Amino acid sequence: MSNKKADSKPQAKYPVNLLDTPFPMRGDLPKREPQWVKEWEERGIYDKIRAASQGRPKFILHDGPPYANGDIHLGHAVNKILKDIVVKSRNMAGFDAPYVPGWDCHGMPIEIQIEKQFGKSLPAAEVMSKARAYATEQIEKQKVGFKRLGVLGDWANPYKTMNFVNEAEEIRALGKIIEKGYVYRGLKPVNWCFDCGSALAEAEVEYKDRTDPTIDVMFAFAEPEKTAQAFGLPALPRADGGIVIWTTTPWTIPANQALNLHPEIVYALVDTERGLLIIAEERVEACMSDFKLTGRIIATTPGVKLANLRFHHPLASAHPGYKRTAPVYLGDYVTTDTGTGVVHSSPAYGIEDFMSCKAHGMTDSDFINPVMGDGRYIESLPLFGGLSIWDANPKIVDALNAAGSLLRSEKYTHSYMHCWRHKTPIIYRATSQWFAGMDVTPRDGGKTLRETALEGVDATAFYPSWGKQRLFSMIANRPDWTLSRQRQWGVPMAFFVHKETGELHPRTLELLEEVAKRVEQSGIEAWQSLDPRELIGDDANLYEKNRDTLDVWFDSGTTHWHVLRGSHKDQLQFPADLYLEGSDQHRGWFHSSLLTASMIDGRAPYKGLLTHGFTVDGEGRKMSKSLGNGIDPHEVANRLGAEIIRLWIASTDYSGELAISEEILKRVTEGYRRIRNTLRFLLANLSDFDFAQHAVPVDEWLEIDRYAVAFSQQLQTELLGHYEKYEFHPVVAKLQTYCSEDLGGFYLDVLKDRLYTSAADSRARRSAQTALYHLTHGLLRVLAPFLSFTAEEAWKVFQPASDTIFTETYYAYPEVAGSAALIDKWALLRDVRGNVTKALEEARTANRIGSSLQAEVTVHASGARYDALTSLGDDLKFVLITSAATVVKVDDEAQESVDVAASKYQKCERCWHYREDVGAHAEHPTLCGRCFSNLFENGEIRSAA
């Protein structure tokens, strides 16, 4: 500022260098953020990032597709923002890290929406047309929400599993796994939802408590002589009685075909008021109590001795249709934790039952399977035909009681399988489905799918590490994958199946490719409208079109094929570096992707898996409508700003649950303000600084400036290490400490005197500004991945000629000679300064001084502290923010102390220091000597601070 300007304004008689900046103190985020979203889109910022990244090594985060249905929720926000932080941080680390968002478009939820709106009788072609339109509308709605959160990506060209090219490539992927020999058709119990009318994937099953009748039922002796022999008796002492089972599914009793015992468990023959009962010996006492009977054990035998004995069906006396016997099979899965140690077996409705009966020679045609796809019994089932299985439960209990077979019935609350969409109970139901075999040896004679997938888990990096064992266990123990679904809105399993034998057409692989070509042009509708004669000619008399669709988990699970190497192969590559989803995806997308890639490529489709937890409220409770504790990200963005959501996510350890509440958001907002205020200070004090014109060479900087840059460079190295390991909450914690303590509480605090009172163009001030320039470059770039709106806003003030901060890479700080020693030295000085600050505060509390500048301090120091303090010379007072500072040497640390005295001198009107030379120039009676020099002469000389 010129003197003339000072004279024209009496209040600025002795001006200081107080500068302003267009970067406002108030973020006004809800208003400004949408403007940035619009600007980023209009100016093609994502494309500019891609152009700037050309030729760098690729880093591929592959987007797990959200379902194209409904508004985005807080879980979506967590997921998309974490991905955005990863992608931006990898771009800034010098990678070419594209982000192609995607959507999962087929499947039941959309089909249900179409049924709700238009009824269930629409022709298939119309269902598909309306489903496509609905999914497109939902995608556009969600896309707006994701962009509002500051997520940058190829929003103009996302992948959609319903795009024709993706549908076609999915059919080709199906061809690949058939060619390799993993796919077979079979009758097997699968998760079945009556409301869906379809099989469900494991990932579509959730568990909720349900209350059902639990019953203990007696199967009467059919072979009393053999039974007596098994127990080492010449004959049974009485004819009445039988073997007792316990079940929580009375509806399966009409389909009973066997009984299972453990070969090594000891079973007792117990004489009771209800006849002779066979029960596991260690369960006798509990069962007698439950049945309200008294009993005497008359013989025991291991389960193996009872193998192949037969017992009458418990409803045999109620209806001739049940006059059959059940054989005893042995199974290691039988336990004595609850029940009787005897398991009743309905092979059509239980996996272990099914496997046991198969192992004992039953064929598919032997299985009794009276439950239809809608949950009702077939009309011909004796006593219960036409009833829903749930309505039949009490009637079956009554019938068992009337037949004299019921020993106990009571209500039982247990965790039970439910459909994740309908929230209704589901069952295991034997149906003819297409499966991918986990333990099938492929045609090339190589490893099984299970073996290959487990090797893939071992070869994958997990963040956090506990995810490895979780996924490993799931793969190790899972059943074969049910690939087929009985729906319309899905990618077809485009097979031609022999009408009598059920065998695939011998030209299946060739035919799948022909279908894929048509789907590529016209979508899956091409299969629906296809006349078989077009492809198989007269074979159409022998073969029919398979009507099943693929599990939607196959849609998303093959995106490594139809997206990474298909629709978006120009941008992406296989394998991906990272898949990032919620912890539920160990049984979902992570899982299905691993299986399909293991079948197609013999390896995992990803190098790393990152898992985040779910959102909970401040008390750790899940978000739910009933609790009224849900938080809408759209509402928070419009009230506080998306930046606050981004900062909350980045500052939370996502490996566990992410707690959020109004109180937590308030704390996050306060943290944001501290960072923003730091940026405002930096930008304001650089507003008259032109690097090309004013920069001071590193070796001419004041010592504290060299320290600040060396310290910031060291911090950046730590932060980049955290970014590389996807550890974002330490990044935020360290940056908040850096802004509030290292900068605001120390360096910038010390700097204010030099910035404000030194001559505007002095070396001392320009040295400080040069350091601030480097600090601002570094700070904005490490903030940008998570505080994207704020970093961009500050960047446009700092570097107005630049398009965007997101084309930058992490800052290369200038090298500071002896930086490690410098950092160590200033750590000592800051420690002493902390002691001085404490002493000053005590003096202020005792009313001995006002501000710290009214104080003169004497520091008694020893050893390295003494050396560090004295090395600063007269500049020590600036570091301590006092008007004078003296150092006295003492022998050891025990003698170290700080003395504070009030200055006896006058206060300078301009710099507020209390100095002996205030008024030394008569024409400026309120000005100190150094301010006079800084204003009217060559300015003071400063070397350290």
Swiss-Prot record:
Location (main, coarse): cytoplasm
Binding site for ATP: K625
Database matches in SUPFAM superfamilies: Anticodon-binding domain of a subclass of class I aminoacyl-tRNA synthetases (SSF47323), Nucleotidylyl transferase (SSF52374), ValRS/IleRS/LeuRS editing domain (SSF50677)
Gene Ontology biological process terms, A to Z: isoleucyl-tRNA aminoacylation
Enzyme Commission number(s) from the entry: 6.1.1.5
Gene Ontology CC: cytosol
Keyword Ligase attached: yes
Subcellular location: Cytoplasm
Amino-acid positions noted as binding L-isoleucyl-5'-AMP in the UniProt annotation, renumbered to this chain: E581
Reaction equation(s) it catalyzes: tRNA(Ile) + L-isoleucine + ATP = L-isoleucyl-tRNA(Ile) + AMP + diphosphate
Quaternary structure and interacting proteins, as annotated: Monomer.
HAMAP family reported in the protein's UniProt record: Ile_tRNA_synth_type1
Function: Catalyzes the attachment of isoleucine to tRNA(Ile). As IleRS can inadvertently accommodate and process structurally similar amino acids such as valine, to avoid such errors it has two additional distinct tRNA(Ile)-dependent editing activities. One activity is designated as 'pretransfer' editing and involves the hydrolysis of activated Val-AMP. The other activity is designated 'posttransfer' editing and involves deacylation of mischarged Val-tRNA(Ile).
UniProt free text on domains: IleRS has two distinct active sites: one for aminoacylation and one for editing. The misactivated valine is translocated from the active site to the editing site, which sterically excludes the correctly activated isoleucine. The single editing site contains two valyl binding pockets, one specific for each substrate (Val-AMP or Val-tRNA(Ile)).
Protein's recorded name: Isoleucine--tRNA ligase
Organism: Burkholderia cenocepacia (strain ATCC BAA-245 / DSM 16553 / LMG 16656 / NCTC 13227 / J2315 / CF5610) (Burkholderia cepacia (strain J2315))
Gene for this chain: ileS
